[in-house]
């Protein structure tokens, strides 16, 4: 086979791969969260971390055993909005029903909340293993994603710092996309 033909076939193959990837990316779900809602999520996170500097004398084991100071606790809220195909729009949120807040977990439900499309929760600072400083828990944890994948919600958001969100979305065909694209508003 002449070199020119081989190069053309290789180029066509690459073009096909890029086209498939672009088609898939264009169909992945996206979410829009207006600034007013993001500001209120930031406020919840800030309030949940008011005493972050009080864990500098704690270590991870102390916190995990529950014998440390539970200065911060996770928070769970129900995201209210709508979806058009795989584009989600959040218009507000309310606290989850039956919420139980713990240092490294939160429980509650949004089952009876009209217009709920998913949940958000906060990740508070935690103690470093050595206890010399607080650490951030950036992003959704593997446990968060496992729970989301096994459920029916279409949206999962974690707030892990002011203006720091991580998002997982369930597409209309059921596949979970993480990290999902958060569109500015």
Predicted ranges, named:
Residues 2-11:
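Bacterial N-terminal signal peptides that target proteins for export
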Residues 10-19:
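Bacterial N-terminal signal peptides
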Residues 21-116, 125-185:
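Conserved beta-strand-loop surface patch within small alpha/beta domains used
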Residues 122:
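Conserved residues at the C-terminal ends of beta-strands
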């Amino acid at each position: 086979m002449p070199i020119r033909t081989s190069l053309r076939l290789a180029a066509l193959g690459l073009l096909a791969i890029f086209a498939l990837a672009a088609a898939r990316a264009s169909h992945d779900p996206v979410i829009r969260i207006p600034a007013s809602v993001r500001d209120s999520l930031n406020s919840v996170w800030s309030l949940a971390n008011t005493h972050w500097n009080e864990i500098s004398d704690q270590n991870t084991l102390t916190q995990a055993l529950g014998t440390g100071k539970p200065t911060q606790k996770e928070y769970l809220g129900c995201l209210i909005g709508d979806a058009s195909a795989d584009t989600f729009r959040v218009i507000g949120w309310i606290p989850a029903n039956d919420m139980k807040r713990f240092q490294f977990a939160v429980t509650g439900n949004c089952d009876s909340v009209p217009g709920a499309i998913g949940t958000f929760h906060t990740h508070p600072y935690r103690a470093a293993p050595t206890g010399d400083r607080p650490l951030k828990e950036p992003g959704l944890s593997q446990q968060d994603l496992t729970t989301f994948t096994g459920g029916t919600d279409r949206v999962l958001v974690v707030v892990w710092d002011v203006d720091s969100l991580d998002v997982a979305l369930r597409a209309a065909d059921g596949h979970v996309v993480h990290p999902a694209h958060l569109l500015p508003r």
